[in-house]
Amino acid sequence: MLMIISPSKTQNFDPRPGIDYTVPAQAARTQRLVKQLRQYSPEDLGKLMKISPKLSDLNWQRYQDFQDSFTQNNAKQALLAFKGDVYNGIEVDTYTPEDFTFAQNHLRILSGLYGLLKPLDLIQPYRLEMGTKLQTDKGKTLYDFWGAQITDALNADLASDTTLVNLASGEYFKAVQPQQLNGKVLNIAFKENKNGTYKVIGIHAKRARGLMVNYAIQNRITAPKALQAFDEEGYGFEPSLSTETEWVFCRN
């Protein structure tokens, strides 16, 4: 069982020494994007990413400062650096070395800049959402740029894990080519009871994705069936709303 999640725009690069790290496998392609983004002015970067002048200046500087090599002086492990709704549900501050090892083997993070990340891959500060319409030599979007690269990387990991548990957003999962995967995809949805009807509420669903990742890591879950016991913060598996390819977890 391999889980995938989206990254986060919010990031924290305060040092966290003493934890193993790896280097992104697709770093060469990352540098191609960085080289291109360095050519943008802060104003053009703001238009491309639809962000404020303050964020435009911040991210322009990030790309100017981006280094060719990844070290603990200029980067941080992805699972530790990303913050935000999904990552608030992942209790990395309590993780043991064994927890990180399990995460490294069973979790992947999709990224517009880095492609496919392992939890302990070092990342430098950035902002580049997968849905950004960035023209490259591969096409008009980042989906064109990454092409089959992300799917190929997932297939390498799925050689021993036959189910891909999709806990990513639609924007990011679009970078995966499900028909080309060596395993089956299991989509997970989290819904809230609103006036007698179960609906997906974005902010709650994001946190729940993180909670499920955390649950799987801390309980060493390697078979999807065991995820049906997930009951964090009031959620429960709802068979009547679920199908073979999408499992729904509800909360009243």
Curated annotation (Swiss-Prot):
Pfam families: H2O2_YaaD (PF03883). It comes from the Bacteria. One of its GO terms (cellular component) is cytosol. GO terms for biological process: response to hydroperoxide. InterPro entries: YaaA. Belongs to the UPF0246 family. HAMAP family: UPF0246. This is UPF0246 protein AM1_4276. The lineage of its organism: Bacteria, Bacillati, Cyanobacteriota, Cyanophyceae, Acaryochloridales.
